[in-house]
Amino acid sequence: MESSGLDGVRWIVEDAMKFVEREVRRGNKYNAIILDPPAYGRGANGEKWVLEEHICRMLECCAELLERKNAFLVLNLYSMGLSSMLARTAVHQAFGVPKFEQMGELYFEDRSKKQIPFGTYYRFKR
C-alpha cells in the first residue's frame, strides 16, 4: 500500500452494518465512504444480509458518518432489481440532494462489444 500512496487508508473487513452503527455511536466522521455491498450474504453467526432489505438503514448510518463538506460517497449495487434511479432516490432520502452526482450501469463488454450488465453505481461529492 505504501508504494501506491494509500498507506493512510483504513480498509474495513468486518460486518459493515455493525461497523457503521458502532462508528455512529462513537461520533466518528469520514471524508469518503465507498459502499460495495453484496446482494445477499450470511454472517458468521447466521445473520442474513439482503440488499433490498438493509440498504436504506446502511445509507442512513452513512449519512451520519460522512462529513458535511469536502466529502464523497460511492455506492455500487449488484442486484439487477435495483436501478440507478432507485439508488439515487435512496441516497437523496438519507443525505439530501447533493450538488454533484453521477449514476449509471455497471457492465462487462464482451469481445463482440456486447454490454452485459451486472449492477448500477451512484456517487456524489459535497
Residue ranges, per PLM feature:
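S-adenosyl-L-methionine
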Residues: 1-34
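Secondary-structure boundary elements
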Residues: 3-7, 67-68, 126
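Mobile active-site "lid"/loop adjacent to the S-adenosyl-L-methionine
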Residues: 13, 30-61
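Short, glycine/acidic-enriched loop or turn micro-motifs at the edges of active sites
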Residues: 17-18, 39-40, 79
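Short, well-ordered secondary-structure micro-motifs
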Residues: 22-24, 44-46, 85-86
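A generic structural signal for well-ordered alpha-helical surface patches
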Residues: 56, 60-63, 89, 120
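Short glycine-dipeptide loop
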Residues: 61, 66-73
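C-terminal catalytic and target-recognition region of SAM-dependent MTase-like enzymes
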Residues: 70-126
